């Protein structure tokens, strides 16, 4: 099984791209961002498997009831934007404990726990053999954290970008929608502008394979982009790769 980190450039359509992967039965992922930080490591480090799963469900409430999502629009699904999803936390915890007794794929114990959390979440609905583990790391700092916190775990990166002028324009328009910079503070605005220019360069320093997907191509050449993805990772091309889940 190959591991992919999704890393988004400013206004680069990362959530859109991940939503296109949601229903593919060879892909394993949580429906949203995994914050690669010390808090996650603390959860994964617990000696009790039950505590790991319990603490994870508390930290990522929206994975188990999408109505609790604040940033992503997973509470506005379907044609009428009124649908949502729920996952039974009791079943998830029990499945994680069971999987922990017999599944060993990664040498890194902490990452093994993260992998099994993915398996427990997915196996409730779909138990087919997986070829690709996808983690939405969201931003470059979290990708850098991954390299520090999970040393020895091999991975590749998919980085979504947007035409620089469109990215700057969208960043500024999004910023101006909110009073007093509540949603996007000045330092975050600076980070976005810096990432437009230096983002790919920073990711290349990790010395991993980095694949670039431009948002404009997702809109205009979707079939070509997804066919190329399937060829690289030996996935079956399916219609679900052409339809966002939200």
Task: Report residues per predicted region.
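Conserved catalytic segments around the Walker B and adjacent sensor/switch elements
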Residues: 27-34, 211
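PAPS-dependent sulfation machinery
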Residues: 33-135
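PAPS-dependent sulfotransferase catalytic domain
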Residues: 120-242
């Amino acid at each position: 099984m190959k591991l992919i980190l999704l890393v988004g450039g400013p206004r680069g359509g990362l959530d859109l791209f991940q939503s296109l992967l949601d229903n593919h039965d060879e892909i394993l992922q949580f429906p949203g961002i995994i914050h690669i930080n010390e808090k996650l490591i603390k959860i994964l480090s617990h000696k009790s498997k039950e505590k790991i799963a319990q603490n994870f469900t508390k930290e990522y409430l929206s994975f188990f009831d999408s109505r609790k999502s604040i940033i992503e629009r997973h509470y506005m699904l379907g044609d009428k934007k009124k649908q949502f999803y729920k996952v039974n936390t009791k079943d998830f915890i029990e499945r994680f404990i069971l999987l922990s007794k017999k599944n060993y794929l990664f040498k890194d114990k902490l990452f093994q726990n993260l992998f099994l959390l993915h398996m427990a979440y997915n196996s409730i609905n779909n138990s087919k053999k997986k070829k690709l583990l996808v983690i939405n790391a969201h931003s470059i700092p979290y990708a850098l954290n991954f390299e520090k916190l999970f040393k020895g775990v091999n991975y590749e990166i998919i980085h979504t970008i947007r035409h620089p002028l469109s990215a700057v324009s969208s960043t500024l328009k999004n910023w101006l929608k909110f009073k007093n910079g509540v949603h996007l503070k000045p330092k975050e605005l600076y980070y976005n502008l810096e990432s437009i220019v230096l983002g790919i360069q920073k990711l290349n320093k990790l010395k991993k394979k980095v694949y670039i997907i431009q948002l404009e191509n997702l809109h205009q050449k979707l079939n070509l982009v997804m066919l190329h993805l399937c060829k690289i990772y030996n996935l079956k091309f399916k219609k679900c790769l052409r339809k966002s889940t939200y």
